[in-house]
């Protein structure tokens, strides 16, 4: 059988992680290009960036592409428009572009029913049931980003502000803030507003470090955020009608294992929490293979990750 070639790419707000690979999992080319959340940069600009990543993979290589699969943050609001765009530029391939939850699920359990919970700057629970796909929570930081790094950081800043006002008692988070940034929060306001959501999310460490030292305010924030995240899991439990597998992904879960431990203690025992050990773009590869009628076994994953990590 002639060799077959596939493209998978994962798009976030910061970067696009794209791979060209073969049917047996060998990565031929791996590129990192600028991110392209269509809500951030606009739909036309975003599509141009997706195409740039695909062209960077194909440059100088005259190989036919069997399938193209792209996972893109916030693409669910644009229906099939991005897929239709890409089909025009890779007409020989089966093309599917969709939101980024499915690839996280597939990276760990293959193309089957399940869910993933992302907890980084933002948060949400994405689910897949047959052909149905959607999310619970994750309506953006202006509406709902429960338990996320941004919410943790924002609540920490509010606790510090309340302590400085005298509305609440002192909190260790004030001291930790000054140690990290070299000035009080009151003197740091310009930088906070300039940095915006990602900068505030980076301050989530205040909650975890202060909580470990027994700080009451930090403990309260931690518990509130765990309650919000567990609500997402319980809502998923009702949607699935019982047990399901939940893949955990995102920087907050990765850096703060106590957050995962606390979540485990507050969700239904029938829900299996699975720590992700593969990058989202591997899930894109699994989905591209699925569109060609192939499943990905252990050898495929081993070869793919070996090539990916080497890059």
Enumerate the language-model features and the residues they cover:
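Short glycine/serine/threonine-biased micro-segments
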Residues: 6, 10-11, 69, 118, ...
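Short loop or secondary-structure boundary microenvironments that flank
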Residues: 72-76, 250-253
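Short, conserved beta-strand segments within well-ordered enzyme catalytic domains
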Residues: 67-71, 96
